[in-house]
Amino acid sequence: MILNIRLDHKTSDVKTMETASGRIEEIVGELEALGAVTEKVPLMTCNRVEYYLHVTGVPPEFDFNGFTVEKDEDALLHLLRLASGLESMIIGEDQILGQIKAARLQALREGTCGPLLDMVFTKAVHVGQTVRRKTKINRGSVSIGSAAVDLAESIHGDLKCKKVLVIGAGKMGTLVARALAEKHLKAIMVANRTYERAYQLACELGGDAIHFDRLNRALRDADVVISATGSPHYILTRERVMDAVPPERRSSIVMVDIANPRDIEESVRELGVRLFTIDDLRGVAEENRKRREAEAREAEGIVRAELELLLRAMKHREVEPLLAEIRGRMESLRQREAGKAIKKIENSKDPERVVEGLTRSIVDKIFHDIALKIRDAAERDDREFLRMCSELFDCDES
């Protein structure tokens, strides 16, 4: 059975998801202790905490501690919709596809992704690429990063005359910075603990890199701050903002925290700063969703068709060991009988007779076992087995 365990932006707020990664690891650990997990792939992003598992023998009473749980076809449908951008807060965003690719590769490196989940995740990536190629679901402003920029614009208006500080030069910070660059902004500052990475991104965007120990000075001058680091601790505490931003500027500064865990302490609001989080981007997501309804409907059709193909492929995969064993036995029989025939044909004046004997011998040996099983079924009055044999050999039932 394939199992998906998750919390995401649809069911939980940021604070709940901040603690979810530890709790989901405990759940998976408990399942592993029961010997129920054969394959696993975690998927952790700012908007979701998920595990995909191949499991056997999960007790019906097992407690999943409030997490959403889906099985088999429902779990597969969720993953394909996720890869297509249909489950994202910003519908159609591309970042999730890269995150799914990375999750698969990491699990393969760690040896936790086996052949079944590898097949499933490979299919998910293919479906995500197909949806984006055949629809316009990812056109325009679709990432969390660009949504954060849109939110800042809705408050400040045109940002061309504003100083924007991006904290974090990882994947999410890069998305934010590029969304800013698309608007041809000049005053972009990038701060990162690793200065070289900040410098690299700033050069790419025509902005300025900031040493992390000079972050307070950058805060003092910024009109918009968008923070997206991977830090487990607050980057901007109440005390830091109070020290860095003069009282007369606090009400005009906009801070958008799109990190998980949070980068900006909630009490910063008490200073008069306008602070927004991922939860506040839901409105932007809803507007985006309305614009993309037609594309989403087309994408849903693609996903459903691809799901049917995946389910068919998985069913084929289940019988491959049986088919391989049958073929192996047939091949062994062929080789044995061919060996006998070759020896005979070397000393025979009638090779046609040898070939005739070879083919008859092969048919007799194959038919012998089949006949035994069919006669046994007839003695047991097993009509279903007899019907299946008729169907298998394309015979009329008598």
Curated annotation (Swiss-Prot):
Residues the UniProt record annotates as site (Important for activity): H78
SUPFAM superfamilies registered for this protein in UniProt: Glutamyl tRNA-reductase catalytic, N-terminal domain, Glutamyl tRNA-reductase dimerization domain, NAD(P)-binding Rossmann-fold domains
PROSITE patterns linked: GLUTR
Pathway note: Porphyrin-containing compound metabolism; protoporphyrin-IX biosynthesis; 5-aminolevulinate from L-glutamyl-tRNA(Glu): step 1/2
pH dependence, record text: Optimum pH is 7.0.
Note: During catalysis, the active site Cys acts as a nucleophile attacking the alpha-carbonyl group of tRNA-bound glutamate with the formation of a thioester intermediate between enzyme and glutamate, and the concomitant release of tRNA(Glu). The thioester intermediate is finally reduced by direct hydride transfer from NADPH, to form the product GSA.
Purpose of the protein: Catalyzes the NADPH-dependent reduction of glutamyl-tRNA(Glu) to glutamate 1-semialdehyde (GSA).
Subunit structure, interactors included: Homodimer.
Name used for this protein in its record: Glutamyl-tRNA reductase
